[in-house]
């Protein structure tokens, strides 16, 4: 089976390295920068892999699975890869933040080919091909034949990959956590900043707006989700840095639209006010300009 991982950053590097451990898989990675091998520091020890590294779409050919792990704002560049990778039977998995996995890529591939995925694999990339994986992590995909086929790709790995009967709710719950992380990008302070009650109140407000919009979109979100998100942030490592924070600190583009902007956009569609998320988007946009 031929598998292409588009975007071998932190999560993509982990995915590609683990898939490459199966000798039945021919794994290749679609990257901007060439590297000699993947080295992943996993919870169980070092993991190495030598997938084929492609640096231009014209080097690619049709595969059985195209797994997208790029940033959400890289859809157009990813589309150039998909044009070469997709054949008559190719399946596409989108492992990204947000709740618009399918919509983001329908300009490039038919919606019925796309398997959206909610990923929880804490990892950081230190250099091309060099990644630290903090936990084995989990991936959730929708129930159905495509979801089951995706789960089967990972049976040889310690990553927990499961189907869920309510993917929409799973995606919005992940968004609730992600949208609260904007306070870290704004303050440039790690997770411990949530210990302060004024900051926790802002996080609760961000998540509360997410809950209202998510429910309007059909997600089954509990009323206590804002408190659950704050409690989770407070219980985790105080020095934890989320990807939005890390990207702003490094001067990289941020996934602001997928994490907070989408709440504002969809809220407007439903007539739901989202002033706190709108303020966060405006402030971070200004900070990045």
Map each language-model feature to its residues.
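Glycine-rich Rossmann-fold phosphate-binding loop(s) that bind the pyrophosphate
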Residues: 8-9
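Rossmann-fold dinucleotide-binding core
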Residues: 95-174, 180
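Active-site-proximal catalytic alpha-helix in oxidoreductases
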Residues: 168-212, 237-238
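Extreme N-terminal starter segment of soluble prokaryotic enzymes
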Residues: 1-4
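NAD(P)-dependent Rossmann-like dehydrogenase/reductase catalytic/cofactor-binding core
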Residues: 204, 208-289
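Rossmann-like NAD(P)(H) cofactor-binding subdomain of soluble oxidoreductases
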Residues: 18, 30, 34, 38, ...
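A generic structural motif
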Residues: 23-27
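N-terminal Rossmann-fold NAD(P) dinucleotide-binding loop
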Residues: 12-13
């Amino acid at each position: 089976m031929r598998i292409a991982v588009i975007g071998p950053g932190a999560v993509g590097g982990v995915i590609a390295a683990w898939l490459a451990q199966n000798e039945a898989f021919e794994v290749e990675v679609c990257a901007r920068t060439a590297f000699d091998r993947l080295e992943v520091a996993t919870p169980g020890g070092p993991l190495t892999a030598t997938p084929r590294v492609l640096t231009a779409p014209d080097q690619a050919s049709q595969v059985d699975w195209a797994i997208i792990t790029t940033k959400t704002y890289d859809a157009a560049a990813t589309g150039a890869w998909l044009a070469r990778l997709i054949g008559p039977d190719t399946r596409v998995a989108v492992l990204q933040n947000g709740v618009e996995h399918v919509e983001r890529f329908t300009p490039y591939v038919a919606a019925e080919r796309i398997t959206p995925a909610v990923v929880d694999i804490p990892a950081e990339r230190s250099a091309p091909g060099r990644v630290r994986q903090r936990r084995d992590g989990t991936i959730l995909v929708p129930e159905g034949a495509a979801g089951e086929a995706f789960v089967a790709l990972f049976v040889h790995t310690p990553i927990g990959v499961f189907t869920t009967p309510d993917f929409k709710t799973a995606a919005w719950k992940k968004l609730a956590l992600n949208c609260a992380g904007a306070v870290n990008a704004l303050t440039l302070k790690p997770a411990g900043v949530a210990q302060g009650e004024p900051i926790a109140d802002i996080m609760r407000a961000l998540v509360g707006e997410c809950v209202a919009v998510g429910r309007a979109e059909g997600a089954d979100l509990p009323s206590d989700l804002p408190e659950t998100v704050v409690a989770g942030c407070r219980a985790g490592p105080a020095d934890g840095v989320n990807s939005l924070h890390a990207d702003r600190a490094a001067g990289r583009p941020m996934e602001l639209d997928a994490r907070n902007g989408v709440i504002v956009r969809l809220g407007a569609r439903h007539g739901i006010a989202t002033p706190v998320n709108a303020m966060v988007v405006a402030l971070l946009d200004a900070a990045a300009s």
